[in-house]
């Protein structure tokens, strides 16, 4: 095989790219070969042997029909998701309330395709999930960033004023928030929904780590305005499987069916996610371990003099640094990869295995005396 790249002389600036994409950078966390990787909020525990065995057999059976297109509407998977949501949140739902796609990013993209677009606006409270503005731009939806308060929580007075001023078609609320880990109460979410002229997407990617009630409990009260998005990439130990979903009134599922690509979710993805849901009790048992480790790590960071936002997730947002990127490099020099999310003076660390957390804390202890 040749290792000569075809047409390398053509650069991005030579292409007739959409003007609003010029100068932008592609999304992506650093993927570096280091001993301790605590930068992408994955569940560090591998799948159970029982899950792997079940997956192998299920994929083997599925492979006999790979010459055929997959089940178009993911009915079996949506049934399994509905059963999970019913038990996890206490809200009775059916497959008609569930939609699944390739990670929550595709779920959010489909919602933006259906409810955003040219001439429409999305609004979010920053810092928050960095893909919200990126997905908005990709769908030609204007994104309006409203700063959070000094404590990184949503300033409700400012939020309601911004909604009145900008009249957004879509509002994003991430709870627990990424990268800060704090939650937005149901009472505040209701205030936002009541003020919203369009739809509200509550991003609950990390909901399993929080004891707070899910926004799905509000769907019957606001069926035409509320969508709750979730993922199997975090607590579910299924980041490599790429499966996201949302819970909403059936009309929202009808809406995204208008924009989804045909057969968007492969037969293998559907089969693997259904297997993961069958073994959810084993997998979600790791949530308690990670929550306990989060408490331990947070306590030690406090002892070392770091500030942090109280977290109900599997990560901690901490500081305060004079130059957070220099501090990020200092952790990397010590073999620990964490995340610089671009927020001045702060970094984010994923909670890993106990020994990984010990390595992080050892590095944090050394760095605390460097005045970075």
Swiss-Prot record:
It catalyses: L-histidinol phosphate + 2-oxoglutarate = 3-(imidazol-4-yl)-2-oxopropyl phosphate + L-glutamate. Its EC number is 2.6.1.9. GO terms for biological process: L-histidine biosynthetic process. It is an enzyme of class 2 (transferase). The modification N6-(pyridoxal phosphate)lysine is found at residue 234. Its cofactor is pyridoxal 5'-phosphate. CDD domains: AAT_like. Keywords: Amino-acid biosynthesis, Aminotransferase, Histidine biosynthesis, Pyridoxal phosphate, Transferase. Pfam families: Aminotran_1_2. One of its GO terms (molecular function) is histidinol-phosphate transaminase activity. Pathway: Amino-acid biosynthesis; L-histidine biosynthesis; L-histidine from 5-phospho-alpha-D-ribose 1-diphosphate: step 7/9. The keyword Transcription does not apply. Belongs to the class-II pyridoxal-phosphate-dependent aminotransferase family. Histidinol-phosphate aminotransferase subfamily. PANTHER family: HISTIDINOL-PHOSPHATE AMINOTRANSFERASE (PTHR42885:SF2), HISTIDINOL-PHOSPHATE AMINOTRANSFERASE-RELATED (PTHR42885). Homodimer. This is Histidinol-phosphate aminotransferase. It comes from Corynebacterium efficiens (strain DSM 44549 / YS-314 / AJ 12310 / JCM 11189 / NBRC 100395).
């Amino acid at each position: 095989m040749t290792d000569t790249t075809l047409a390398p002389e053509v650069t991005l600036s030579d292409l007739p790219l959409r003007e609003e994409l010029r100068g932008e950078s592609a999304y992506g966390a650093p993927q570096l070969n280091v001993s301790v990787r605590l930068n992408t909020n994955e569940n560090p525990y591998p799948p159970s042997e029982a899950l792997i065995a079940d997956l192998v057999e299920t994929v083997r059976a599925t492979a006999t029909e790979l010459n055929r297109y997959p089940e178009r509407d993911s009915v079996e998977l949506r049934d399994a998701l509905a059963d999970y949501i019913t038990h996890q949140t206490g809200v009775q739902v059916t497959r008609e309330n569930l939609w699944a796609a390739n990670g929550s990013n595709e779920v959010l993209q489909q919602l933006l395709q259906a409810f955003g677009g040219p001439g429409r606006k999305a609004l979010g409270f920053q810092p928050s999930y960095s893909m919200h503005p990126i997905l908005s731009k990709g769908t030609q939806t204007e994104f309006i960033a409203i700063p959070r308060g000094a404590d990184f929580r949503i300033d409700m007075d400012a939020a309601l004023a911004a909604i009145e001023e900008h009249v957004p078609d879509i509002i994003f609320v991430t709870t627990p928030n990424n990268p800060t880990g704090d939650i937005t109460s149901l009472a505040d979410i209701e205030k936002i929904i009541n003020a919203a002229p369009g739809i509200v997407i509550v991003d609950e990617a990390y909901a399993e780590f929080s004891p707070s009630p899910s926004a799905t409990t509000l769907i019957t009260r606001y069926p035409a305005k509320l969508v709750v998005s979730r993922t199997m990439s975090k607590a579910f130990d299924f980041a490599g499987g790429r499966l996201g979903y949302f819970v909403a009134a059936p009309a929202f599922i009808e809406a995204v069916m208008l924009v989804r690509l045909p057969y968007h979710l492969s037969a293998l993805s559907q089969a693997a996610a259904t297997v993961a849901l069958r073994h959810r009790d084993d997998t979600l048992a790791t949530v308690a371990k990670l929550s306990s480790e989060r408490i331990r790590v947070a306590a030690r960071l406090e002892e070392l003099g770091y500030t942090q936002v109280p977290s109900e997730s599997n990560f901690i947002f901490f500081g305060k640094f004079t130059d957070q990127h220099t501090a990020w490099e200092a952790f990397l020099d010590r073999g620990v990869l964490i995340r610089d999310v671009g927020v001045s003076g702060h970094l984010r660390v994923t909670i890993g295995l106990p020994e990984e957390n010990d390595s992080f804390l050892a590095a944090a202890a050394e760095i605390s005396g460097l005045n970075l």
